[in-house]
């Protein structure tokens, strides 16, 4: 037997041995490396502990997730009741044209100059992010993201084989955009884009015109994509203007905007979003992924189209409610010894620093080992909004999406918890 044959015989026996061992010990094939490095949601990973707390009869105040309690507009339910179709057929892969036309008119109200041809309806804003990354990023490509950032950006980047390069903002600066030089330092031949969320989730920060201009100049200088998540545009509280990426002149073809009806119409379960771009090549590529998933939800599109006609007084009432909740929560947090949070300018979240050793442990402890008069609080550990594992250890994200009476109770319970938490630092 020559050397090559001996090598083949050895390798074949090795493989046979491996198969026999797997069968003997009932070892299943391994999951993908992509799946193994996919981060858990900091928003949802504590749900099992929350469920167990509720089973014990504990009232859980949910400040962990952006699920508004404001009733969905009546026009949405009216549209649902009026559906009289005989067949719930596929819609076009890019969405119903009448919905895209109405979305374009809606965007015009915000000085966003697009047509229905620039709009692709997606199954939630998350699919818009996912399809954009799959269409624009190759494995090993890099995107620069200000952090803390919505955790699903990293998850979808991993799915595309891309790498998130973070630029860290700080609570001391109110989570303002870091110096643009920090972005430029990270640019390499593999850098394909910058991603922003404006107004920001999780911090509530609202980017200024000056900050947006600096991003524009960098995008133009290096010919990058500008991915812009703008689902919270309705929620800007300080009088400062909302600046869309589409307001930035000279980079119109670089901009890919993400949108959703989930937050502005309180329709998180509808799963209707949009990807908006003037870049025809990107749209054509995105459409391939849209065709592979066939169509966005038909019923959801019908309801979303009707929701665009939500009365202005509904929107104003909702806006005023969030203004009050924001002030109530921020004032209440900053009155608790050792707690600090800046004033968020938009969205309905804030990131707070707590006098604790580890936010992940604290948030789990609240649900598994603590209750005050049958109540506890659920929050999102901020570590999950950073790429680096050592950041956000003493920070949490809170969503002011419950009524003020419950916010007051949640704040009181949080104060009591911090007084007895074994890992408190003051």
Model-predicted segments: where are they?
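PLP-dependent class I/II
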Residues: 7-10, 18-20, 24-31, 35, ...
